[in-house]
A protein has these predicted regions:
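Short beta-strand-to-loop capping motifs
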Residues: 170-174
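Helical (often loop-to-helix) elements that flank the catalytic cores of nucleotide-handling enzymes
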Residues: 175-193
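Conserved catalytic core of nucleic-acid polymerases
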Residues: 53-163, 190-194, 198-200, 204-205
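Acidic, glycine-rich two-metal-ion catalytic cores of nucleic acid-processing enzymes
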Residues: 1-60, 110, 114-150, 159-169, ...
Length: 205
C-alpha cells in the first residue's frame, strides 16, 4: 500500500493526486506538541509563533530552536534552560504526574479520560510518562477536531480526504468556500496555530 503521510513534498510525488471537486486545501497545526504541553502546564505563549518564542528564549535561530524544544520535551530539560518558565512548569508537572503514578498506581489523561495503570506499564520513567499523556492528548484533541469538521461537512460536497497527526486535507467544492471559514474557527477556538496550502494538486506548487 501507499503511505500517503510519507510522500515526498519536494520531488513531485504528490502532483498526481487531484481533487474530485475543485481544489485541495490542507491545514497544518503548527508547534502542536509544544502547544498541547503549554495547555497541560498552564503556560501561555505570548508570541503568535511558538517556535519563534522559543528562539528568543534560547537566543538561537528558528530551526535550532525547534530542535532544542523537541529534544527537551522528549528527553528532559538541558541544564542551561532549566530556569526558563516553560521548562520550570514542565518539570513541576512531570514530577507531579510521576508522584501520582507512583503513589496511586495510575493517572487519568485529560479529555479522553484514558487511564494508564502502573501494573501494565513496564520500564516507565517520568519523561516517558509525560510523553504518553501528551500523545494521548494529541489523539483526543484530534478526535474532537474531526468531530467538529464532520459536523460542518455533513451534507456538503466538500470532504475531508486525508488526516495525518497534525494535518487535515480537504477536497473543496468551489461553491462551498464558506466551510473553510467555519473549519478555521474550529482551530481558532482551540487556540491552535494553523498554516495552510491550497491548489489544484496535492503538490500545492
Amino acid at each position: 500500500g501507499v503511505n500517503y503521510a510519507a510522500l515526498n513534498k519536494e520531488n513531485g510525488d504528490r502532483k498526481c493526486f487531484i481533487p474530485r471537486n475543485d481544489f485541495l486545501f490542507e491545514l497544518d497545526i503548527g508547534a502542536y506538541h509544544p502547544t498541547l504541553l503549554g495547555k497541560l502546564v498552564d503556560y501561555d505563549f505570548d508570541s503568535g509563533d511558538i517556535h519563534m518564542a522559543f528562539s528568543e528564549m534560547y537566543g538561537v535561530d528558528y530551526q535550532k530552536a525547534k530542535e532544542l524544544t523537541f529534544k527537551q520535551m522528549y528527553g528532559g530539560v538541558f541544564e542551561q534552560y532549566k530556569e526558563l518558565e516553560f521548562f520550570k512548569k514542565m518539570t513541576v508537572y512531570t514530577d507531579d504526574l510521576w508522584a501520582r503514578f507512583q503513589n496511586e498506581g495510575s493517572i487519568e489523561c485529560p479529555i479522553s479520560k484514558h487511564i494508564y495503570k502502573k501494573e501494565y506499564l513496564e520500564d516507565m520513567k517520568p519523561q516517558k510518562l509525560l510523553n504518553y499523556v501528551l500523545q494521548n492528548l494529541e489523539t483526543a484533541m484530534n478526535v474532537c477536531i474531526l468531530w467538529e469538521i464532520f459536523k460542518i461537512l455533513k451534507g456538503k460536497n466538500t470532504k475531508l480526504v486525508l488526516y495525518t497527526f497534525d494535518s487535515f486535507l480537504l477536497d473543496v467544492d468551489e461553491n462551498e468556500k464558506k466551510v473553510i471559514e467555519e473549519i478555521l474557527k474550529v482551530f481558532k477556538n482551540k487556540k491552535l496555530q494553523i498554516k495552510y496550502n491550497y491548489g489544484s494538486t496535492y503538490d500545492f506548487r
